[in-house]
Amino acid sequence: MTKLKIKTDKPLTTAVLTSKKLTVKAPREKIDSASKFYATGKRKNAIARVWLKVGKGKIVVNKKTIDQYFSSETYVKTILQPFVLTKTIDQYDVICTVRGGGISGQKGAILHGISKALDKSAPDFHAMLRKGGLLTRDSRVVERKKYGQRKARKKTQFSKR
């Protein structure tokens, strides 16, 4: 695969040459920074990248709707917590990509990311989100296993004689 850079009178475009097939990628449009807010959230081993923009309340996680991605309704309610707290439900669209960890960690990472993005969007939300504990990163992670033991804290059975 060979990458060619082609200069035209239009903005710079990238052409990719793959086995005698030439495809041209158009440049991405510039996004107005005043209407879109970005934040990252973390929980356990999960990292969520969250983009928040003014909209109708649509939430997309890894190119799936929130109901398709999270099967449990309690997870969805937890993720919507920052919007309920700030009374902004159905006012923002959320697009996020999340990697690593399990479902619970990913839920926490998305929640943290949405809270941080809402904080950036309007400074008056900061006090509400801080009081609700949504801006603080939950630093609890799995304790490591120790040698000579079965698990992190479980020991082998002790025999007196």
Curated annotation (Swiss-Prot):
Pfam families, A to Z: Ribosomal_S9
GO MF terms, alphabetically ordered: RNA binding; structural constituent of ribosome
Keywords, in A-Z order: Ribonucleoprotein, Ribosomal protein
Gene Ontology CC terms: cytosolic small ribosomal subunit
A GO BP annotation: translation
PROSITE patterns recorded: RIBOSOMAL_S9
Family: Belongs to the universal ribosomal protein uS9 family.
Protein name as it appears in the record: Small ribosomal subunit protein uS9
Upper lineage: Bacteria, Pseudomonadati, Pseudomonadota, Alphaproteobacteria, Rickettsiales
